[in-house]
Swiss-Prot record:
Subunit relationships: Homodimer. The tRNA molecule binds across the dimer.
rRNA-binding keyword on record: no
Family of the protein in this entry: Belongs to the class-II aminoacyl-tRNA synthetase family. Type-1 seryl-tRNA synthetase subfamily.
The organism of origin for this protein: Mesorhizobium japonicum (strain LMG 29417 / CECT 9101 / MAFF 303099) (Mesorhizobium loti (strain MAFF 303099))
Protein name from the UniProt record: Serine--tRNA ligase
Length: 434
């Protein structure tokens, strides 16, 4: 959530930021004008309430003076005034809550402001290559896509998955099931033992306010799955970013404890409401998938350096797996709602003859912290400031499995197991059809 004081002082800058995110000039200007009007109405009302409270306090003292001087008529008149003010304040406090909610609701649908060095663009075609790692091999005529290989091995079953759950689900078996588990364990071990992340096993169902904190709600409600719980509901996490980031919600962290670095391997659940017709075959876009998430909580001075570090941690996964990839700087029009800057890591898939996203690493500034009320103590201990939050995939496990299958496939239909995964698979070197 953006700072209303910043908006008040920089309305033109916000209009320009929204335009960079592909808002029309008219929509951006009217939105900012509406926000400022809501803010002014709230501030005027609060000022009026404060004036009434001051008058009530003064009148209460005057009642005592009138009683002591024997002026009963004045005392009664003042008592009536105090009673009227009390009623006004009670109604006014309810109105203040309404104005607060209206302002918060308006702020909640505004995206974050991109950093100055983010390339301006409309969509993925305007993203910029940061660097390329690994050589893309010449495509052989026998190369297949992951689902063709998996089905031929008898270890990837989409038909039975559809019988169980419908479309966009997969049943993995035998060697491929074992390799997906190995990939997740390898990633966790790398991030915890070498990259300094603390492993967490979080809840997979969370409250609405937690989803609001990491900006899934209200904007992306249709992408989520919910289950009834008591008189309300719980949402299934679309990413472990949600519970990991919210670990610091409504807390004040000591400065010397920062940065906090968390990682988790969890299933993720997404309705893929906006993805009809995209990647309908295979495992690329699923309702349920495993992902290793990286989350960092930093002070306001360290977040940009932490963003570079986090991205390098995610890239290291692909380097160890010896998979070709490229890292992209997302343009303003393709960047996520809560991000100030995002790097997408795209792994090479020979079967598709294309790079596909496997990780997205974003720095959010204090955007999520304001929604969560997550702060830290200043170095001097005199004040509290909002933390900065970062999140990234370290990486998507299912997509890493896809990349391994396609890049390590052999002409006979077998899949060579990357060296780094073999200790997790009992020394096995190859997956073959039974």
């Amino acid at each position: 959530m953006l700072d209303i004081k910043w908006i008040r002082d920089n309305p033109k800058a916000l209009v320009e930021a929204l335009a960079k995110r592909s808002w029309s000039a008219g929509e951006a200007q009217s939105t900012v004008d509406d926000l400022i009007a809501r803010d002014e109405a709230r501030r005027e009302h609060v000022t009026e309430l404060q004036t009434k409270q001051e008058r009530r306090n003064a009148a209460s003292k005057e009642i005592g003076n009138a009683m002591r001087s024997g002026d009963a008529a004045l005392a009664e008149k003042l008592k009536a005034e105090v009673g009227d003010i009390k009623t006004f304040i009670q109604n006014g406090e309810a109105r203040e809550r309404e104005l607060d909610k209206a302002l918060t609701d308006a702020l909640a649908v505004l995206p974050n402001v991109p950093l100055d060095d983010v390339p301006v663009g409309k969509d993925e075609h305007d993203n910029v290559v940061k660097h390329i790692v690994g050589k893309v091999p010449t495509r052989s005529n026998w190369v297949k896509e992951h689902f063709e290989i998996g089905e031929a091995l008898g270890m990837m079953d989409f038909e039975r998955a559809a019988k169980l759950s419908g479309s966009r689900f997969t049943v993995l078996k035998s060697g491929l099931a074992r390799m997906e588990r190995a990939i997740g364990q390898f990633m966790l071990d790398l991030h915890t033992t070498e990259h300094g992340y603390e492993e967490v096993i979080p809840p997979l169902m969370v409250r609405d306010e937690v989803l609001f904190g990491t900006n899934q709600l209200p904007k992306f409600e249709e992408d989520l799955f919910f289950t009834p719980h008591g008189e309300g509901r719980l949402g299934l996490i679309p990413t472990a970013e949600v519970p990991l980031t919210n670990l610091v919600r409504e807390e004040i962290t000591a400065h010397e404890k920062l940065p906090l670095r968390f990682t988790a391997l969890t299933p993720c659940f997404r309705s893929e409401a906006g993805s009809a017709g995209r990647d309908t075959r295979g495992m690329l876009r699923q309702h349920q998938f495993y992902k290793v998430e990286l989350v960092s909580i930093t002070d306001q001075d360290s977040s940009l350096a932490e963003h570079e570090r986090m991205t390098q941690c995610a890239e290291e996964v692909l380097k160890r797996l010896e998979l070709p990839f490229r890292t992209m700087v997302l343009c303003t029009g393709d960047m996520g709602f809560g991000a100030r800057k995002t790097y997408d890591i795209e792994v090479w898939l020979p079967g598709q003859n294309a790079y596909r996203e496997i990780s997205s690493c974003s720095v959010c500034g204090d955007f999520q912290a304001r929604r969560m009320d997550a702060r830290y103590k200043d170095k001097d201990g005199k004040g509290n400031r909002f933390v900065h939050t970062l999140n990234g995939s370290g990486t998507a496990v299912g997509r890493a499995l896809i990349a391994v299958i396609e890049n390590y496939q052999n002409e006979d239909g077998s899949v060579t197991i990357p060296e780094v995964l073999r200790p997790y698979m009992g020394g096995l070197a190859k997956i073959e059809a039974k």
